[in-house]
Amino acid sequence: MVMQPGAAPDGPERTFIETARRAQIARAAIDTIAEVGYAGASFARIAERLGISRGLISYHFAGKDDLIKQGVQEAAEQAIGYIRPRILAESSGPAMLRAYIEANLAFMRDHRSNVIAMIEIARSAEGRRIFDDDTAVLNAVGALENLLSGSQTAHQLRPGFDPHVMAIAIRAAIEAASPLLALDPEFDIDHYASEIATVFDLATRIGDGPTGPEAD
């Protein structure tokens, strides 16, 4: 059979093996970008990393953009799978907010290559946007806003703040850690997470005293 670029079927027709192979290639692409940069992450380089032929990558992906989109999706799903259970394990608004912040930053700590790759994917060396993730940003803000507003409705967080503005501020504080983690070997992301979680606990709480370990 002659394999054509992007010839692997989409949707329900894609087999379990094909889906697993696409995920494997996408993860390897993210790791390769983290190691050699966006420009250096060629199909040949990714194939070498996996010990497969370049043609096999071309069979599963129509081009580099297609592969990178899949890589970003894989990274996002990995993050959701890590973060969501830690939030849902908590039962109060303040505890869920702290878990949200600390889990996001813990995931970044444990998946540093993802952080580096996302920085590379977001911008070229000239600052030109390579991959447009505006929808993902809006979705992240919206989900956090829902958590905050729901906790306000349940009388678990202070009613006087704007949940949309607060969600933007929290996401900005989390994302600010990305370049520091990527570039500064001395950056203590665990300390940063604890401090940021306390800052937003103080900004959103109803009663006196923080909800974190400082209260013990």
In which residue ranges do the predicted regions lie?
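C-terminal peripheral helix-coil segments that are non-catalytic and often amphipathic
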Residues: M1-P9, A106-D110, V141-A154, A169-D216
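Hydrophobic alpha-helical connector segments
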Residues: Q70, G81-N114, P163, A167-I170, ...
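Amphipathic alpha-helical segments used for helix-helix packing
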Residues: M96, M108-R128, P179, L183
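Amphipathic alpha-helical packing segments from all-alpha helical-bundle domains
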Residues: E77-P85, D110, I116-A117, R128-A154, ...
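Helix-turn-helix
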Residues: Q24, T32-D66, Q70
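Short, structured helix-loop boundary elements
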Residues: R22-A23, F43, D65, K69, ...
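Conserved hydrophobic residue
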Residues: A39, L157-R158
